[in-house]
Design a protein with these regions (language model features):
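Anionic-ligand binding region
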Residues: 17-18, 26, 37-60, 65
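Phosphate-binding loop/pocket of nucleotide- and phosphate-handling active sites
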Residues: 109-147
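Glycine-rich beta-alpha junction loops
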Residues: 8, 31-36, 54-56, 64-66, ...
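Short Gly/Thr/Asp-enriched flexible loops that form oxyanion-binding sites at enzyme active sites
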Residues: 12-22
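Active-site-adjacent helical/loop segments in soluble small-molecule enzymes
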Residues: 66-123
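Single conserved hydrophobic/aromatic residue that forms the stacking wall/gate
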Residues: 1-11
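Residues at the starts of beta-strands that form the adenosine-phosphate
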Residues: 24-26, 125
């Protein structure tokens, strides 16, 4: 529970930092399509809970958005992109093969979203944050073997 709360704070803190620095950087959130309570909440303009959050990217398995984080994200995020477990796994493999970095599912989600939006982002300066390598070795081996 604490880990998921910290994940919600991750985008919140980036929004706050951007605002404190007076930047106009667009910040895009990413959620698992199987755990999209935050995306649904932003679309509804109020907190929406989900019955399940069935994703292997456990750092994104949020069913109930934290109110403080929701308010900051609603006010400061450009949008939220939903990514599938398959897209997350692909991003994990890209990090492993191309940069020799280990990324957990939630940590690779930003790259998955960027890949999904590659045409929309073409020609733009984009930053992606890789965070977290907290993944079970057997699960990581399965993800790598799928590619």
């Amino acid at each position: 529970k604490e880990y998921r709360r910290q994940r919600q704070m991750c985008i919140r803190d980036r929004i706050r930092t951007r605002d404190l620095l007076g930047l106009d950087t667009q910040i895009v959130g990413v959620v698992s399509s199987a755990a999209d309570a935050f995306a649904r909440s932003l679309e509804a303009g109020q907190i929406v809970t989900t019955e399940t959050a069935d994703t292997f990217a456990d750092g994104m398995a949020c069913r109930i958005p934290q109110p403080e984080a929701f308010e900051i994200i609603r006010a400061g995020a450009a949008r939220i992109v939903r990514v599938s477990d398959e897209e997350i796994a692909r991003a994990m493999r890209i990090y492993h093969e191309d940069t020799h970095n280990t990324a957990e599912g939630a940590g690779a989600a930003g790259l998955a979203a960027l890949y999904q939006e590659r045409e929309r982002q073409r020609g733009r300066r984009v930053g992606v944050i890789l965070s977290g390598a907290n993944i079970d070795r057997q699960q990581y081996a399965r993800v790598l073997a799928e590619g």
